[in-house]
A protein has these predicted regions:
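Juxtamembrane or sensor-core-proximal signal-transducing alpha helices
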Residues: 149-182
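Hydrophobic transmembrane alpha-helices and their membrane-interface boundaries in multi-pass
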Residues: 20-110, 129-131
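Select subsegments of transmembrane alpha-helices in polytopic membrane proteins
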Residues: 16-23, 117-124
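Transmembrane helix interruption/hinge and helix-loop junction motifs
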Residues: 37-42, 95, 115-122, 137-145
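Short helix-perturbing small/polar motifs within transmembrane alpha-helices
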Residues: 108-120, 154-165
Length: 191
């Protein structure tokens, strides 16, 4: 494995993560519009914006795969749209609306965990707005359970990132050592 293939691997990982994130948001928001969990309101503007933005970004990224889309910015934007959707819908439900809030929070956490299993920043930016919206809308009820649901994936992704960084450092060190030994052997064969 060369340094060039190493960089290509990370670029491909970035593209797949972005595409998966956009696809999961598109599917989840489409399902929220077509078959809503609680039928108090079927259509919300933020949910329609998520469908439109994720669909357009998916098409754009498919057409021009070399152009970079800033994942933290997109994840924060989608996180804020999801939080807006949750608040809009929760305000129309009759209290207690804890069941809806927990299901909405878990849905957003699943999207973030699946798409950003190697990017804690993007996961946090995507999930934090909805988490805060759910805490506020729950009015202090079940805050410990919601905090646990939010912190568990953060801990898992952080541990996975630590393990992955150690593995990457070991692999990179091994590759550098092999390249150095190859250069040494080439120098010796020249003599």
């Amino acid at each position: 494995m060369t340094a060039q293939t190493w960089r290509a691997h990370y670029a491909q990982k970035y593209q797949y993560s972005l595409r998966l994130f956009l696809l999961l948001n598109f599917i989840s928001s489409s399902l929220s519009l077509v078959t809503p969990l609680f039928t108090v309101v079927r259509f919300t503007l933020p949910c329609a914006l998520i469908v439109a933005c994720s669909g357009l970004l998916l098409l754009w990224h498919w057409k021009w795969p070399q152009s970079k889309i800033n994942i933290p910015t997109i994840s924060l934007l989608f996180g804020m749209l999801w939080a807006w959707h949750v608040v809009t819908k929760a305000m129309l439900l009759t209290p207690p609306h804890f069941n809806y809030l927990v299901i909405a929070l878990l849905s957003i956490l699943f999207i973030g965990t699946i798409a950003f299993s190697n990017n804690i920043t993007a996961f946090t930016l995507h999930s934090l707005p909805t988490f805060l919206a759910c805490l506020i809308m729950a009015e202090g009820e079940q805050w410990l359970r919601m905090t646990y649901c939010f912190m568990l994936p953060i801990a898992g992704i952080t541990l996975q990132n630590i393990i992955q960084k150690r593995s990457d450092a070991f692999t990179q060190g091994l590759m550098d050592k092999l390249m150095h030994e190859r250069n040494t052997l080439n120098d010796l064969s020249m003599l």
